[in-house]
Amino acid sequence: MADLKPSLTGLTEEEAKEFHGIFVTSTVLYLATAVIVHYLVWTARPWIAPIPKGWVNLEGVQSALSYLV
């Protein structure tokens, strides 16, 4: 006998659980990758100055911008 209450997505219960597992795993991997990459970029060039002269690496950018303005 057919299901009396068909799914809105057309997936069976087993297929929905499999899809959910893959979705959760890929989301966790994406977030972990983003955290690692943000940490690596932060160590290379912090975007918030931790000390008063924390923006010394941007002196070249300031001189380049002076030519544009």
Swiss-Prot record:
Record-annotated membrane-spanning stretches: 22-44
Residue numbers binding a bacteriochlorophyll: 20, 38
UniProt keyword GTP-binding, yes or no: no
Cross-referenced PROSITE patterns: ANTENNA_COMP_BETA (PS00969)
MF-aspect GO terms: bacteriochlorophyll binding; electron transporter, transferring electrons within the cyclic electron transport pathway of photosynthesis activity; metal ion binding
Periplasmic face residues: 45-56
Major localization listed first in the record, in broad terms: membrane
InterPro entries: Antenna_a/b, Antenna_beta_CS, Antenna_beta_dom_sf, LHB-1/5, Light-harvesting_complex
Propeptide position ranges: 57-69
Role this protein plays: Antenna complexes are light-harvesting systems, which transfer the excitation energy to the reaction centers.
Oligomer and partners: The core complex is formed by different alpha and beta chains, binding bacteriochlorophyll molecules, and arranged most probably in tetrameric structures disposed around the reaction center. The non-pigmented gamma chains may constitute additional components.
Family matches, as NCBIfam families: pufB_517_ASD
Family per record: Belongs to the antenna complex beta subunit family.
Name of this chain's protein: Light-harvesting protein B-1015 beta chain
Originating organism: Blastochloris viridis
Lineage, uppermost ranks: Bacteria, Pseudomonadati, Pseudomonadota, Alphaproteobacteria, Hyphomicrobiales
Gene: pufB
